[in-house]
Regions:
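HEAT-repeat alpha-solenoid elements in large eukaryotic scaffold proteins
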Residues: 6-17, 41-51, 98-103, 127-133
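Amphipathic alpha-helical scaffolding segments comprising HEAT/armadillo-like alpha-solenoid repeats
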Residues: 27-39, 61-76, 95-128, 147-159, ...
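Non-membrane alpha-helical segments in proteins
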Residues: 46-57, 69-72, 84-92
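Short inter-helical turns and helix N-cap capping residues of alpha-solenoid HEAT/ARM repeat scaffolds
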Residues: 43-44, 78-79, 119, 133, ...
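Eukaryotic acidic, Ser/Thr-rich intrinsically disordered low-complexity regions
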Residues: 199-231
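N-terminal "cap/leader" segments of large eukaryotic alpha-helical scaffolds
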Residues: 2-42
């Protein structure tokens, strides 16, 4: 019978880079960083978590284009806690650090290349993180700003009754906060549909009851449209 004990890797590596060091391409040469990068694909969530912490603590996540790319691939990680940490790391890498310094251009360019091509699965993963950890909203908005087509995926979520009420609400909110103006017509149609059904329900009390999702989301749709239409 196989043992149930899970091997937890140990990464021994001091912080690789100080704030004054912006050279990239050397982080991958350090054994601890390389081992941690490989463990990002480990099927055991706790191992992936330790690997991610190592890459952040050594500074490699902000310095190495390869490491930043590998971290970005975990945006669809099934573990919500780990995915939330990925969002925080990536969002922070796209902003100045405590000293006001940006990550190397090679890192931001690599992230822009990957994040600009996000699909529904990654976008949905970001919305789930927002529901789970609302305090990560700035990082999520920063990431979505890079993906010009994310608005299309978000409006699909907002329209889908298969999604939970909170997912739909957060999708609508993100559309307004990032500023996806192309989503205005779809939101207007959603508003008209909701208002028409509400009016019909009020004039015909014998009609089937309105879904709670639609009635509850109408204020969110109106608020989003107000923000998107403002100068």
């Amino acid at each position: 019978m196989k043992s149930d004990t899970t091997h937890k890797p140990s990464y021994t590596q001091p912080r690789l880079f100080g704030p004054e060091s912006t050279s990239s391409g050397v982080a991958e040469l350090f054994p601890a960083v390389w081992n941690a990068a490989e463990d990002l694909a480990n099927p055991i969530a706790s191992v992936r978590q330790l690997a991610l912490e190592c890459l952040e603590n050594t500074g490699a996540s902000r310095i190495s284009p390869l490491v930043s790319y590998l971290i970005a691939t975990r945006l669809n990680d099934p573990d919500i806690e780990l995915r939330s940490q990925v969002v925080r790391i990536l969002g922070n890498a796209l902003a100045p650090d405590a000293n006001g310094d940006m990550a190397p251009e090679a890192v931001t360019s690599q992230l822009a290349y990957y994040l600009s091509d996000m699909r529904t699965r990654q976008i949905f993963g970001l919305v789930e993180v927002l529901v789970h950890k609302p305090e990560l909203a700035p990082q999520i908005i920063r990431i979505l700003n890079i993906c010009v087509f994310a608005g299309n995926h978000l409006i699909e979520m907002a329209n889908s009754r298969k999604m939970s009420l909170e997912i739909r609400r957060k999708a609508i909110w993100l559309i307004s906060q990032v500023g996806y103006l192309e989503a205005i017509p779809a939101l207007e149609r959603l508003q008209i549909r909701m208002e028409t059904r509400i009016t019909g329900q009020q004039s015909m009390p014998f009609a089937p009851p309105l879904g709670v999702d639609d009635s509850d989301l109408l204020p969110d749709v109106k608020s989003a449209l107000l923000i998107l239409r403002s100068p």
